[in-house]
Amino acid sequence: MAFALPSSLVSVCDKSFIKPSSLTPSTLRFHKLSFIDQSLSNMYIPCAFFYPKVQQRLEDSKNSDELSHIAHLLQTSLSQTLVSYYPYAGKLKDNATVDCNDMGAEFLSVRIKCSMSEILDHPHASLAESIVLPKDLPWANNCEGGNLLVVQVSKFDCGGIAISVCFSHKIGDGCSLLNFLNDWSSVTRDHTTTTLVPSPRFVGDSVFSTKTYGSLTTPQILSDLNECVQKRLIFPTDKLDALRAKVAEESGVKNPTRAEVVSALLFKCATKASSSMLPSKLVHFLNIRTMIKPRLPRNTIGNLSSIFSIEATNMQDMELPTLVRNLRKEVEVAYKKDQVEQNELILEVVESMREGKLPFENMDGYENVYTCSNLCKYPYYTVDFGWGRPERVCLGNGPSKNAFFLKDYKAGQGVEARVMLHKQQMSEFERNEELLEFIA
């Protein structure tokens, strides 16, 4: 599974820092981080969007430097967008505060000496895709004082481009990232006709205040990138429908969701591939914007999450109908809870602090803990900078292990799963016959 792209394919043409187009008011100078924000390491969320053929949108038809023009267009719109997303133009003052000093976001312009299809069609695509992400940044720990947003635009020989973003997890989650991308792309797309002013709502520490739980020091996630690998799996609509029908009949669960059946199958197959199979636990992250009262709008920026989990202590627990039945039960329980006062993620962080370990490390005595982030129904494939929908949206390969990321495949056609496991476990996992039955 070892594979690396030659560094000679990539040449950095320009590196600059993009400041907000207007100064941040002094009243907004310091952005307070919530308890959940503080519990996260200073990592970036890395993602990239591939646009196969970009037609130049030139006011000056004599301009022949396409990369320079595209970069200028994106830089101008990014500068305008950062006025509303001002914390991402600042720096971490400490683990509790962002200094919104308009330092700016880092912006890289890169040429890649191959066609986009060579990357997208590569047998090790999840590794090949990393060529369009800023070097050494995906999932890295961002030191205090570093940029909280890093953007790279990469132009391929075929004329296609990739736009990648490393977005500080300290300030926002996957929903926050999508809000930013949609706003930035809208400003880019409509720059000649309207003056869009994005209106994100930063909640800071107003929902999960550190006054309740106390402040935290920044946790450091230590893992060996060379020992962790990512696998991209596609569950086509027809096979996914067959899996859902099978599980519904055998479990009695009405209309099992795509995320329920796929995460259960991944959990079962990953656990089976582990050298120490049982007991195991599967932890699902929840976006709680619509679960708390009063409901928060989708444009709320922050880490607004909770968790629910299921466990397996014997082989009967690992049967798909049982797993899906338990997932449905636990998510229903989660929706009945007060997700501010009874937030399971906060309870796990507090318990981990008490025991001097990282969250989800040997959780409740379970050595095998898998996490699942469900981004299905998050419209990443609608992010349009003016060149149509992306051909592919990818997540940067990183040092995480025992992690599943689910999202729509090409605007709702099935599910794409990014699975991160230890490389020895992955070699067993990807040969599982039950898994192979339902993937493309």
Curated annotation (Swiss-Prot):
Keywords: Acyltransferase, Transferase
Tissue: Expressed in fruit 20 days post anthesis.
Classification via InterPro entries: CAT-like_dom_sf
GO BP terms, alphabetized: alkaloid biosynthetic process
Tagged with keyword Acyltransferase: yes
Annotated EC: 2.3.2.35
Presence of the UniProt keyword Acyltransferase in the record: yes
Family (UniProt): Belongs to the plant acyltransferase family.
Protein's job: Involved in the biosynthesis of capsaicinoids and capsinoids natural products, pungent alkaloids synthesized from phenylpropanoid intermediates in the placental tissue of chili pepper fruit acting as repellant on herbivorous mammals and conferring spiciness to hot peppers. Catalyzes the biosynthesis of capsaicin, a pungent component, and of capsiate, a non-pungent component, from vanillylamine and vanillyl alcohol, respectively. Can transfer an acyl from 8-methylnon-6-enoyl-CoA to vanillylamine forming capsaicin and CoA.
Catalysed reactions, semicolon-separated: vanillylamine + (6E)-8-methylnon-6-enoyl-CoA = capsaicin + CoA + H(+); (6E)-8-methylnon-6-enoyl-CoA + 4-hydroxy-3-methoxy-benzenemethanol = capsiate + CoA
Protein encoded by which gene: PUN1
Top-tier EC class: transferase
Entry GO MF terms: aminoacyltransferase activity
Lineage: Eukaryota, Viridiplantae, Streptophyta, Embryophyta, Tracheophyta
Name the record gives this protein: Acyltransferase Pun1
Active site: H169, D384
